[in-house]
Regions:
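C-terminal scaffold of the Radical SAM
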Residues: 2-14, 26-247
């Protein structure tokens, strides 16, 4: 409801009817919306009826192209056959599924609520609901992740033939549980480049830990991703994003 109220307030702001301390006015004259992205958070916690209301509010304020690409992020742990069909009927034309890894151990380490099998079920539910444009989010350079494990994740996803694949390298952000556990390790890797170059006391400190991949391993994962996806016909359109021709 709050999001819908914000959308509905845009015409007033554009007409100069917003408070002095509000954001600068928008000039919407002549603008047509070609893409809409509903991100999160976890938008797939919303029922399809709520998504339909949000899109209706957008159309009341903006001129939306009839064939606009409308993307919604979805967590595989929350997407069901019924909700996938509901989102498609509500007007969503593209789903972005956050798999991150095909390794159960790596998923647990990331604190994800879904399993590999749940992702498969969600992907199939999306296809059955009529989604012919699906993105899968992946994450490399995870603690304890080997090049072989990353290659297995890529193989698993490529076999499903999604239209888009996003492959991001992990960034350990301050204020996150991962930073609490790996913040010092990140700083030491940035300083020394790899574990072999660290002082003996640090090598001993990290011995036996699920260590973050060093810079060379991270780079190898990136190049393997780029090479593998290119061979399968995916084109890179941003640094970490790949798509089949026409998408």
């Amino acid at each position: 409801d709050q999001l819908i109220r914000e959308i509905e307030s845009i015409p007033e702001e554009d007409a100069g009817q917003c408070p002095e301390n509000a954001a600068p006015r928008l000039n919407l004259t002549g603008l047509t919306v070609e893409t809409i992205f509903i991100g999160g958070g976890t938008p797939s916690l919303l029922p399809p009826s709520a998504v339909e209301r949000i899109l209706a509010a957008v159309r009341q304020v903006f001129r939306v192209e009839p064939d606009a690409e409308i993307t919604m992020e979805a967590n595989p742990g929350t997407l069901t056959p019924d909700s996938a069909a509901g989102y498609r009927n509500a007007g969503v034309s593209r789903l972005s599924l956050g798999l991150q890894s095909a390794s159960e151990e790596e998923l647990r380490l990331l604190g994800r609520i879904h399993t590999r099998e749940q992702f498969l079920q969600s992907f199939r539910a999306a296809r059955d609901a009529g989604f012919d444009n699906i993105n899968v989010d992946l994450m490399s350079a995870l603690p304890g992740q080997s090049e072989e494990s990353w290659q297995e994740t890529l193989r698993f996803v490529c076999d499903l033939e999604p239209e888009h694949i996003s492959a991001y390298s992990l960034i350990v952000e301050e204020g996150t549980p991962l930073y609490e556990e790996y913040g010092e390790m990140c700083a030491d890797l940035e300083k020394y480049g790899d574990y072999a170059s660290m002082p003996k006391r640090l090598q001993t400190k990290y011995e036996g830990c699920k260590c973050l991949p060093d810079e060379e391993t991270d780079r190898n994962m990136y190049h393997h991703t780029k090479t593998t996806l290119a061979k399968l016909g995916y084109e890179r359109y941003e640094i970490s994003n790949y798509a089949r021709p026409g998408y």
